[in-house]
Amino acid sequence: MSDPLTAMNISREALSRASVLVVGDVMLDRYWYGEVDRISPEAPVPIVRITREEERNGGAANVAYNVVTLGARSSLLTVVGDDEASHKLEALVLGTGISAYFGRDPDLKTTVKLRVIGRQQQLLRLDFENTPRNEVLASQSAVFSSLLPDHQAVLFSDYGKGGLAHVADMIARARDAGKQILIDPKGSDFSRYRNASVITPNRVELRQVIGSWLDESDLQAKCQSLRQQLGLDAVLLTRSEEGMTLFDAEGQLHVNTQAREVFDVTGAGDTVIATMATLLAAGLSLRQALPLANRAGGLVVGKFGTAAVTYEELFA
């Protein structure tokens, strides 16, 4: 297989002209780091003495962050609460150069994932969340339409938090506008993603929809059937240590993972789909973008927490 970088001459300038609209569920990723040197007398749990705190973009915000880290432009459309976490998240997003379009629901608690870290490993995660009101979600529809002309690709990042209740309508409008449409899916109902360009489930997510498969031949048959039923251009199955497989009209294309030490898988799927969207927006085909997206996923698992891959790392 030819090197997509050489074949398509993907320069920094080419990526800087690419623009991806990210729509979906955002969250604030909080990390509390501490020292663990004793067990609580109240219960058989470690006592963590917090020494450092950190906050990062999470969910769809991390996807958009991955796009701009590669050197492309990204807009982020989402719904958040009107609380401390949402304002902190907005500041983080704007600080990375992402164009933020935050709809605010005063009844919504902005999703926060708080991870407690001790001895270089995650000890505990606390989630704070609820579901946005339909009226607030509907109000973002006009904003979505106004943003479409300025982007070559639209990426829907579904974390199942309720922010993509109107995704079917948005996909239809993006399709009519001739955009590349990428979906990071959630749940067992993939019919809501009908007519997207590509969906990127992992093995667990795919199994919820098509059931188990006997072998690679059975997997290919089921994925092709799903692709045709939903009118998708492709299904991209991410397979962790087994790499990833693209199922499209040409058949099946598999790329193996690049061997490296896995430090943290948090956000790896975000990096894969963000890289794919960026390269499609820059003019590559799905098959040309696949090896680079796979490489990006392999690089990011060597970093801690929600992270991103730079242009220099990807094209080293």
Locations of the language-model features?
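Short gly/ser/thr-rich secondary-structure transition/capping motifs
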Residues: 2-6, 138, 179-185
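Conserved N-terminal subdomain of the carbohydrate kinase-like
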Residues: 11, 19-20, 28-153, 308-316
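A short, aliphatic-rich alpha-helical micro-motif
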Residues: 15, 148-149, 193-194
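Active-site metal-binding loops of divalent metal-dependent hydrolases
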Residues: 26, 159, 271
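Buried hydrophobic positions in well-ordered alpha/beta secondary-structure cores of metabolic enzymes
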Residues: 67, 76, 114, 154-157, ...
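Conserved phosphate/ATP/ADP-binding segment of small-molecule kinases
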Residues: 153, 161-253
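Conserved post-catalytic alpha-helical subdomain immediately downstream of the catalytic base
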Residues: 233-234, 258-315
